[in-house]
Amino acid sequence: MIKKASLLTACSVTAFSAWAQDTSPDTLVVTANRFEQPRSTVLAPTTVVTRQDIDRWQSTSVNDVLRRLPGVDITQNGGSGQLSSIFIRGTNASHVLVLIDGVRLNLAGVSGSADLSQFPIALVQRVEYIRGPRSAVYGSDAIGGVVNIITTRDEPGTEISAGWGSNSYQNYDVSTQQQLGDKTRVTLLGDYAHTHGYDVVAYGNTGTQAQTDNDGFLSKTLYGALEHNFTDAWSGFVRGYGYDNRTNYDAYYSPGSPLLDTRKLYSQSWDAGLRYNGELIKSQLITSYSHSKDYNYDPHYGRYDSSATLDEMKQYTVQWANNVIVGHGSIGAGVDWQKQTTTPGTGYVEDGYDQRNTGIYLTGLQQVGDFTFEGAARSDDNSQFGRHGTWQTSAGWEFIEGYRFIASYGTSYKAPNLGQLYGFYGNPNLDPEKSKQWEGAFEGLTAGVNWRISGYRNDVSDLIDYDDHTLKYYNEGKARIKGVEATANFDTGPLTHTVSYDYVDARNAITDTPLLRRAKQQVKYQLDWQLYDFDWGITYQYLGTRYDKDYSSYPYQTVKMGGVSLWDLAVAYPVTSHLTVRGKIANLFDKDYETVYGYQTAGREYTLSGSYTF
């Protein structure tokens, strides 16, 4: 880890705090430029969520964590474990880069977008979330933003927890971190979660057969990590985790064919790294291997039957990153190498698939008087579509003490996914989708209120679409996204308030029609307080109107889905210094709504849990 004092001295800027549960402006983040830096020096809007926040919200899924954050719009085909999509600032679900400990999530390689309904919440110790383009640092996918899920635990100790809730939900978790001598620590975790679920209905998406069954979810997780400090400057780590999930869902049925309504996902990841943390120079070398097997099958025949489908991908990654303190800032440079291989049949591709990508990048951060400058440039060499370059730049001006104006511009891209390139309807000549983004923002501290308001525009070209006549994918689509985002956090006596507002106008630039499944407006409000040792929390979310497709008849019709206001209530009580009990009511007023047309949401749900630490 970087020594905090040296970087704070090099980047000594006025403290501005973005929307986050951890409101300290000097909170260190690693996602912006791959090395730790104070959040106040990151000019892009940044949110940090800690494990303490997740426990206070009593979230049982990663999607429940992310839905609370500015700019995020989550859609899901029902309840726990069902297919979900993340839209950030109106961009496509495939325009979000999801990292696990700084390494690209493997599952995103098969489908082209990350489905975090499958990722275990037990592994999440911290989330760093950056909005806006970041391809100049990370390469493909980082058009709407970057979500970095960090699994490293900060504090030693052991925790045993259990929870129960509606729809026969149950969860059991054991985790421990122990110091072995002065220089070595080990972390272990095991988690089991299961819910019977409910019938998501899937109106218009099941073919000729109604499927009036519960659509449940089961997840089993193991995690282990070993960290060692060789000297004050040199350290290394090895970690691995895996999860085994089963999801029941409502599938499309064709008469005379098996009903593939069960999903079985196996995923494992292994990382190893070596870090050098000097006073002026920082360097890290990280290697990673991940392997996922994703079955969809009819449980009457089993996942090895010829009717079943299998998406299998292996991902190999090597990252070498370096950072040098220069003046009142730093310069960074590095190389990424990634190889993805698939087995025949993955993504409906008959043959096996192998794709390599090598990226080199340069980043810079510097303070000059009242100005802060940030920039990055990157070149990717891909075995499929050749070389592609991206860049971004930002400038911040503290025009009055405690108030800052920020202007930024960046380019980014999304590489075509496996099915689009080599599937039955694939086109190997596809180009990457490209984005140009502008943003202007004011932020400051006024009468105890940390606030930020920004306006942005994102023009996306060469969008990949499907042609009903040629039965092929092609580059032609264009999107124009305009938006306003406002965030604030403040205290009034014992009450802590966190609020955000998003207005997103995301349209097809050719037809001027709204992009599907994006809420035009969102309001999010979190209120926390303590009363007689009880920790209370109220969460409010307003989801505005959105459009979707009704697939129950042909030709498909566009439908308008009305807005909804949702409330959650959570409370926790420390029975002793070691034992805490928690309870939560989600969707307090039992609102009936959908985020994907035809797929029901859960309605009111209750959970009760307890944790014992020692």
UniProtKB/Swiss-Prot annotation:
The chain crosses the membrane at residues 158-165, 169-178, 184-195, 217-227, 232-248, 263-277, 279-296, 309-325, 328-337, 353-369, 371-381, 385-400, 403-417, 434-443, 449-458, 473-490, 494-509, 517-529, 535-550, 558-572, 585-596, 602-614. It comes from Escherichia coli (strain K12). Calcium increases vitamin B12 binding affinity by a factor of 50-100. Involved in the active translocation of vitamin B12 (cyanocobalamin) across the outer membrane to the periplasmic space. It derives its energy for transport by interacting with the trans-periplasmic membrane protein TonB. One of its GO terms (biological process) is monoatomic ion transmembrane transport. GO terms for cellular component: cell outer membrane; membrane; pore complex; transmembrane transporter complex. Pfam families: Plug, TonB_dep_Rec_b-barrel. InterPro entries: B12_transptr_BtuB, Plug_dom, Plug_dom_sf, TonB-dep_rcpt-like, TonB-dep_rcpt_b-brl, TonB_box_CS, TonB_rcpt_b-brl_sf, TonB_rcpt_CS. It is a multi-pass membrane protein. Residues 1-20 form the signal peptide. Ca(2+) 1 binds at D199, Q211, D213, D215, D250. Residues 166-168, 196-216, 249-262, 297-308, 338-352, 382-384, 418-433, 459-472, 510-516, 551-557, 597-601 are extracellular. The keyword Hydrolase does not apply. Keywords: Calcium, Cell outer membrane, Ion transport, Membrane, Metal-binding, Porin, Receptor, Signal, TonB box, Transmembrane, Transmembrane beta strand, Transport. Belongs to the TonB-dependent receptor family. BtuB (TC 1.B.14.3.1) subfamily. The keyword Isomerase does not apply. It is found in: Cell outer membrane. This is Vitamin B12 transporter BtuB. Cyanocob(III)alamin binds at L83, S85, N92, V110, S111, A251, T309, R517, Y551. Interacts with TonB. A motif (TonB C-terminal box) lies at residues 597-614. Induction: Constitutively expressed. Primary control of btuB expression by cobalamin occurs at the level of translation initiation. Disruption phenotype: No longer takes up colicins E1 and E3; colicin K uptake does not change. Ca(2+) 2 binds at D213, D215, Y249, D250, D261. Residues 21-157, 179-183, 228-231, 278, 326-327, 370, 401-402, 444-448, 491-493, 530-534, 573-584 are periplasmic. Residues 38-152 form the TBDR plug domain. GO terms for molecular function: ABC-type vitamin B12 transporter activity; calcium ion binding; porin activity; protein domain specific binding.
